[in-house]
Structures are given as structure tokens and as C-alpha cells.
């Protein structure tokens, strides 16, 4: 049981790091080319959706394994 929660904490940490890296790249790209901010925004939303989807699958598996 404790190992399941530890794995969930690691998955949550991975999601946080991935979202931080995504936002870092977005801000760097927006600083270089402000004209493409609308395109970057749609890609950012899609990227965050995939990252959060991976976390939710991990969360469901942790409850199923429990």
C-alpha cells in the first residue's frame, strides 16, 4: 500500500517536471518569435493534456493495483 502511494508521488513529480519543461520551452519560443504565440498556445494546451492524461492513467492503475 505504501509503495503504491510512493509510486503515485513519483508520477506526480514527473508530471510537474514535464509541465515545467513545457512552459520553459514555450516562454523561450515566445520570446524569440512573438508572432507565433497563438500557435504555441494551442500546442501547449495539447501537450499539457497529454501529460495530464498520462498522470491520470497512472492514478487509475494505482487504485486498481491497490
Swiss-Prot record:
A Pfam family reported for this protein in Swiss-Prot or TrEMBL: ATP-synt_C
Source species, domain of life: Bacteria
Keyword Oxidoreductase assigned: no
Keyword check for RNA-binding: no
Gene Ontology molecular-function annotations: lipid binding; proton-transporting ATP synthase activity, rotational mechanism
Name of the protein in question: ATP synthase subunit c
Subunit relationships: F-type ATPases have 2 components, F(1) - the catalytic core - and F(0) - the membrane proton channel. F(1) has five subunits: alpha(3), beta(3), gamma(1), delta(1), epsilon(1). F(0) has three main subunits: a(1), b(2) and c(10-14). The alpha and beta chains form an alternating ring which encloses part of the gamma chain. F(1) is attached to F(0) by a central stalk formed by the gamma and epsilon chains, while a peripheral stalk is formed by the delta and b chains.
A GO term from the CC aspect: plasma membrane
Origin species: Streptococcus oralis
Amino acid at each position: 500500500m505504501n509503495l503504491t502511494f510512493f509510486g503515485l508521488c513519483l508520477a506526480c513529480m514527473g508530471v510537474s517536471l514535464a509541465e515545467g519543461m513545457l512552459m520553459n520551452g514555450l516562454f523561450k519560443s515566445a520570446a524569440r518569435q512573438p508572432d507565433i504565440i497563438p500557435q504555441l498556445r494551442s500546442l501547449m494546451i495539447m501537450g499539457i493534456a497529454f501529460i495530464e492524461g498520462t498522470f491520470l492513467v497512472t492514478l487509475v492503475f494505482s487504485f486498481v493495483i491497490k
